[in-house]
From Swiss-Prot:
GO terms under cellular component: extracellular region
Temperature dependence, free-text field: Thermostable. Still active at 100 degrees Celsius.
Disulfide bonds: none
Keyword Ligase set for record: no
Keywords noted in UniProt: Antibiotic, Antimicrobial, Cleavage on pair of basic residues, Cytolysis, Hemolysis, Immunity, Innate immunity, Secreted, Signal
Name of this chain's protein: Ceratotoxin-D
Function in brief: Female-specific peptides with potent activity against Gram-positive and Gram-negative bacteria. They have as well hemolytic activity.
Gene Ontology process terms (BP): defense response to bacterium; innate immune response; killing of cells of another organism
Subcellular location: Secreted
Positions of the propeptide removed during maturation: 24-35
Keyword Repeat carried by entry: no
Signal peptide as annotated in the record: 1-23
Coarse class of the protein's main subcellular location: secreted
Lineage of the organism: Eukaryota, Metazoa, Ecdysozoa, Arthropoda, Hexapoda
Originating species: Ceratitis capitata
């Protein structure tokens, strides 16, 4: 279950970081772009942790219900 939690948090982190980078102004200078990505990831980590704490119990409940329906 720890691997599932890690994958889930990575997906949330990537989604939030992507939206932060897309929403941020772009620049042709690669250093500025790297800093923007770094800042987006730093901002996304705490948000991903909060979302993960709420979403993982919901996902577990849904998986158990689906497992009962299928099995």
């Amino acid at each position: 279950m720890a691997n599932l939690k890690a994958v889930f948090l990575i997906c949330i982190l990537a989604f939030i970081a992507f939206h932060c980078v897309v929403g941020a102004p772009t620049a042709e200078d690669s250093i500025v772009v790297k800093r923007s990505i770094g800042t987006a990831v730093k901002k996304a980590v705490p948000i991903a942790k909060k979302v993960g704490k709420v979403a993982i119990p919901i996902a577990k409940a849904v998986l158990s219900v689906v497992g009962q329906l299928v099995g």
